[in-house]
UniProtKB/Swiss-Prot annotation:
This is Speedy protein E4A. Promotes progression through the cell cycle via binding and activation of CDK1. It holds the Pfam family Spy1. Testis-specific. One of its GO terms (cellular component) is nucleus. The gene is Spdye4a. Residues 1-26, 43-97 are annotated as: Disordered. Keywords: Cell cycle, Nucleus. GO terms for molecular function: protein kinase binding.
Length: 268
């Protein structure tokens, strides 16, 4: 490992973790609840608004030639202009359009490819459909420019915990966590990287370097880190295994990204 003073420049990451322990795992559902509530209110206002041309009988109206009392003038309800209702609908939908589009994207459909042809018989093989979308690559690339993340990757010169396959798994985990793009922070990068080392590395000692970089020799913040890691795994539905094929597909999306050069086989 390289030399440096770990735990100093990571104060912002610790402060973010202490300020919001949920780290967006619940914020997405709360936001959706607000959006649905606003939609229900607008729907109720339409149902309760009177329709044009509908009148209700009032006391004193003559029915079958008999009068039930003093007649009162009929007043027709004046409905709201349709243009104002449509405008209010458009205004309410503008704030939630992007989030809903990202949340309710249809699941990828299975893809079949021909594996073998033998005479008139054909054998099909089901191809795996990746759940990684362009916004997940964009979030990952943006986090690579964070000063703490950039310093960590420079610090791990021997690629003990951050080679190209482990970093590919970070993107895969981002695609499964179910968070909105704007909710990802540097702490999510370290949570995903720690989990990737948990899954792939036989030697579990190097992943302790992540703690050493973030918190130094202090053990006070480690229980909180593990709590956030558990929340992160649960948000993925416990789907934490990533195949080598998926890692290579993730790297092929943007092969010129500089982190894909972090190959242990090239170390001398």
């Amino acid at each position: 490992m390289g030399e440096g003073t770990p735990g100093v420049d990571s104060a912002r990451v610790q402060e973010e973790g202490g300020r919001d322990q949920s780290l967006g795992f619940v914020e997405g559902r709360i936001q959706v609840g607000r959006i649905v509530t606003a939609g229900q209110l607008s729907l109720c206002s339409e149902e309760q608004s009177p329709q044009p041309g509908i009148t209700r009988p009032s006391p004193g109206v003559v029915v079958d030639g008999e009068s039930s009392g003093l007649a009162e003038p009929r007043v027709e309800a004046t409905p709201q202009p349709p243009s104002s209702i449509q405008k209010r609908k458009r205004d309410e939908s503008l704030d939630s359009e992007d989030d809903l589009a990202e949340l309710f994207e249809p699941d990828p459909q299975p893809v079949w490819s021909v594996e073998m042809l033998c005479g008139l018989r054909m054998r099909l093989k089901r191809r795996r459909v990746s759940t990684v979308r362009p916004e997940h690559h964009k979030v990952f690339t943006k986090l690579l420019e964070d000063p703490v993340v950039k310093k960590f990757l420079t610090w791990d010169k021997m690629l003990r915990v951050s080679d190209k396959y482990l970093l590919s798994m970070v993107i895969a985990y981002f695609s499964r966590a179910g968070l909105f793009s704007w909710q990802y922070r540097p702490i999510h990068f370290f949570l995903a990287l720690y989990l990737a080392n948990d899954m792939e590395e036989d030697n579990q000692a190097p992943k302790q370097d992540i703690f050493y970089f973030l918190y130094g020799k202090s053990y006070a913040q480690r229980p909180m880190f593990h709590k956030l890691r558990f929340q992160f795994i649960r948000s993925m539905g416990w789907k934490i295994w990533v195949s080598r094929e998926e890692c290579e597909e993730i790297q092929a999306y943007n092969p010129d990204l500089w982190v894909w050069a972090r190959d242990r086989t090239n170390l001398t």
